[in-house]
């Protein structure tokens, strides 16, 4: 029996098993086996040749955003509208066959936008170019899931399932579980909170399935067996996702209102160029970027060339971005902006910068 058949059998077994106290250990084991087989499926084949058209794109700009969706939901049209890149767009499926990059220039930042080929159902099993599409998606900072508003619910659940099966966790945080395999001493299990979904016995069963008999486990939050399996496997990607419902000109106002109220969702129409500005604002928020402007002594700030950093970046991060040796020569910095009580304020390396702050660095 091949890996795909084993995965299919386990999925059927999970679907027909009623969830209750008596079956929780059985379900936990099935989920551990399923995660193990899926990990094997995603490993690149040793016999596979490396010939063929290049697919991955070199990372550039200040952030990377992956456009994911089924064929013909409007990804190529969106890329053409947002960037200067022309991605071939047509009203039939599978127009885009390779990964097309573009750059959005917004608030001084260059955001790389990747138009990935349309995902079809079963992409995780390698159908179409699904596996390559998902591999590129794992390298992004944010995923934009493009959905056709006329069939958005069906597409959304299918795409979420595909991404979940390859270890991409959308709009979730990494489980707060400390896990460390050891050479001996058995399994040490502790928790700082009351656990309602995992027990010591279930944790041991899951670890034994992965041939781990000596480990230290500490739960700092109430997690499910699936989340614990994610911690053991360790190659999961936790990523913010923006659900974008396109073609809202083809549905009723009531349906548009319902979709717009969903969490992490934006409604747009690429054909009529509706709501694209709001989508850019939301994307900026999800990327959590800040613009920092520099100032030389006795001169005006340079507002033409911003330093783009992650939200919560310190003065030390700014120093490293300017020059790697600057932090070692640092004496103090003068900062103007919302991060200070008064302007300018003299600060040290640990000071946290805010969006559109101005900084002047003084060396020793």
Swiss-Prot record:
<keyword id="KW-0547">Nucleotide-binding</keyword>
<dbReference type="GO" id="GO:0005634">
    <property type="term" value="C:nucleus"/>
</dbReference>
<keyword id="KW-0963">Cytoplasm</keyword>
<feature type="binding site">
    <location>
        <position position="96"/>
    </location>
    <ligand>
        <name>Mg(2+)</name>
    </ligand>
</feature>
<dbReference type="GO" id="GO:0003723">
    <property type="term" value="F:RNA binding"/>
</dbReference>
<dbReference type="GO" id="GO:0043231">
    <property type="term" value="C:intracellular membrane-bounded organelle"/>
</dbReference>
<dbReference type="GO" id="GO:0005654">
    <property type="term" value="C:nucleoplasm"/>
</dbReference>
<comment type="function">
    <text>Catalyzes the conversion of GTP to GDP through hydrolysis of the gamma-phosphate bond in GTP.</text>
</comment>
<feature type="binding site">
    <location>
        <begin position="94"/>
        <end position="98"/>
    </location>
    <ligand>
        <name>GTP</name>
    </ligand>
</feature>
<dbReference type="GO" id="GO:0005737">
    <property type="term" value="C:cytoplasm"/>
</dbReference>
<dbReference type="GO" id="GO:0046872">
    <property type="term" value="F:metal ion binding"/>
</dbReference>
<feature type="binding site">
    <location>
        <begin position="246"/>
        <end position="249"/>
    </location>
    <ligand>
        <name>GTP</name>
    </ligand>
</feature>
<dbReference type="GO" id="GO:0003924">
    <property type="term" value="F:GTPase activity"/>
</dbReference>
<keyword id="KW-0379">Hydroxylation</keyword>
<feature type="domain" description="TGS">
    <location>
        <begin position="288"/>
        <end position="363"/>
    </location>
</feature>
<feature type="binding site">
    <location>
        <begin position="69"/>
        <end position="76"/>
    </location>
    <ligand>
        <name>GTP</name>
    </ligand>
</feature>
<dbReference type="InterPro" id="IPR045001">
    <property type="entry name" value="DRG"/>
</dbReference>
<dbReference type="InterPro" id="IPR031167">
    <property type="entry name" value="G_OBG"/>
</dbReference>
<dbReference type="Pfam" id="PF01926">
    <property type="entry name" value="MMR_HSR1"/>
</dbReference>
<feature type="modified residue" description="(3S)-3-hydroxylysine">
    <location>
        <position position="21"/>
    </location>
</feature>
<protein>
    <recommendedName>
        <fullName>Developmentally-regulated GTP-binding protein 2</fullName>
        <ecNumber>3.6.5.-</ecNumber>
    </recommendedName>
</protein>
<dbReference type="GO" id="GO:0005525">
    <property type="term" value="F:GTP binding"/>
</dbReference>
<feature type="binding site">
    <location>
        <position position="76"/>
    </location>
    <ligand>
        <name>Mg(2+)</name>
    </ligand>
</feature>
<dbReference type="GO" id="GO:0007165">
    <property type="term" value="P:signal transduction"/>
</dbReference>
<dbReference type="InterPro" id="IPR006074">
    <property type="entry name" value="GTP1-OBG_CS"/>
</dbReference>
<dbReference type="GO" id="GO:0005829">
    <property type="term" value="C:cytosol"/>
</dbReference>
<dbReference type="InterPro" id="IPR005225">
    <property type="entry name" value="Small_GTP-bd"/>
</dbReference>
<dbReference type="InterPro" id="IPR004095">
    <property type="entry name" value="TGS"/>
</dbReference>
<dbReference type="InterPro" id="IPR012675">
    <property type="entry name" value="Beta-grasp_dom_sf"/>
</dbReference>
<dbReference type="InterPro" id="IPR027417">
    <property type="entry name" value="P-loop_NTPase"/>
</dbReference>
<dbReference type="InterPro" id="IPR012676">
    <property type="entry name" value="TGS-like"/>
</dbReference>
<feature type="binding site">
    <location>
        <begin position="115"/>
        <end position="118"/>
    </location>
    <ligand>
        <name>GTP</name>
    </ligand>
</feature>
<dbReference type="Pfam" id="PF16897">
    <property type="entry name" value="MMR_HSR1_Xtn"/>
</dbReference>
<keyword id="KW-0479">Metal-binding</keyword>
<keyword id="KW-0539">Nucleus</keyword>
<keyword id="KW-0378">Hydrolase</keyword>
<dbReference type="GO" id="GO:0016020">
    <property type="term" value="C:membrane"/>
</dbReference>
<dbReference type="GO" id="GO:0002181">
    <property type="term" value="P:cytoplasmic translation"/>
</dbReference>
<keyword id="KW-0460">Magnesium</keyword>
<feature type="binding site">
    <location>
        <begin position="269"/>
        <end position="271"/>
    </location>
    <ligand>
        <name>GTP</name>
    </ligand>
</feature>
<keyword id="KW-0342">GTP-binding</keyword>
<dbReference type="Pfam" id="PF02824">
    <property type="entry name" value="TGS"/>
</dbReference>
């Amino acid at each position: 029996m091949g890996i795909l058949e084993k995965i299919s059998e386990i999925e059927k077994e999970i679907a027909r098993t009623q969830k209750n106290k008596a079956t929780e250990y059985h379900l936990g084991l099935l989920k551990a086996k399923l995660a193990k087989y899926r990990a094997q499926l995603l490993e690149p084949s040793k016999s596979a040749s490396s010939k063929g058209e290049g697919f991955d794109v070199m990372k550039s700009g200040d952030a990377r955003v992956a456009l994911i969706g089924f064929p013909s939901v409007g990804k190529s049209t969106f890329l053409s509208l947002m960037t200067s890149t022309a991605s071939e767009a047509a009203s039939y499926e599978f127009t885009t066959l390779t990964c097309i990059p573009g750059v959005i220039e917004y608030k001084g930042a260059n955001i790389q936008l990747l138009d990935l080929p349309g995902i079809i159902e079963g992409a995780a099993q390698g159908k179409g170019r699904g596996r390559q599409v998902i591999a590129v998606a794992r390298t992004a900072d944010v995923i934009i899931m493009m959905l056709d508003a006329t069939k958005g619910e069906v597409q959304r659940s299918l795409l979420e399932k595909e991404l979940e099966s390859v270890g991409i966790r959308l709009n979730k945080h990494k489980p707060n579980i400390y896990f460390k395999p050891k050479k001996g001493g058995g399994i040490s299990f502790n928790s700082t909170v009351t656990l309602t979904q995992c027990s010591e016995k279930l944790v041991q069963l899951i670890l034994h399935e992965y041939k781990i008999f000596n480990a230290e486990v500490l739960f700092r939050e109430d997690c499910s067996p699936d989340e614990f399996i994610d911690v053991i496997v360790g190659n999961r990607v936790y990523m913010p996702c923006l659900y974008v419902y396109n073609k809202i000109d083809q549905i009723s106002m009531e349906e548009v209102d319902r979709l717009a109220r969903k969490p992490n969702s934006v409604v747009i129409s690429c054909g009529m160029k509706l709501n694209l500005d709001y989508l850019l604002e939301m994307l900026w928020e999800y990327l959590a970027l800040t613009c920092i402007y520099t100032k030389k002594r006795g001169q005006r700030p340079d507002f033409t060339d911003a330093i783009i950093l992650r939200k919560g970046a310190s003065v030390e991060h700014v120093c490293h971005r300017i020059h790697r040796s600057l932090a070692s020569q640092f004496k103090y910095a003068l900062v103007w902006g919302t991060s200070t009580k008064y302007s300018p304020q003299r600060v040290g390396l640990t000071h946290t910068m805010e969006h559109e702050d101005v900084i002047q660095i003084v060396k020793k």
